[in-house]
Amino acid sequence: MGLQLLTDRVRRVRRDNAEHRLSWLLRSRRLKGHRFHRQRAIGPFVVDFICVERALIIELVGAQHVLGLGPDAQRKQFLESLGYEVIRVWDSEVLSDPRAVLKKVLAHF
């Protein structure tokens, strides 16, 4: 197995773990009674988490992303043009300090 393939696999597993953990933190209306959906399509994009009633999207960001550049900026601009607020959270932050992530999300309510 090539180094790049192995690196990609590690990133994918880490992202999956972070996504699963965040899903667990957001489930059962734990954040002020608001419901979050996971992996929902909006236009040509699939967002990680969305609270429809608050028009709030949470996107997990891995080390492979560069904030504010390329397709991520276009994606965010598109979602904001539809009235959504987009919060970007590093997957490493979800895994290392989930309480800080919840505080960050709660600040938008």
Question: What do these predicted regions represent?
Answer:
Residues 1-35, 81, 109:
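Solvent-exposed, charged helical/coil patches
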Residues 11-15, 43-108:
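Basic, amphipathic alpha-helical patches used to engage nucleic acids or provide basic targeting signals
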Residues 23, 39-44:
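Short secondary-structure junction/hinge motifs that connect adjacent elements
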Residues 26, 40, 89:
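Residue-level signal for inorganic ion chemistry
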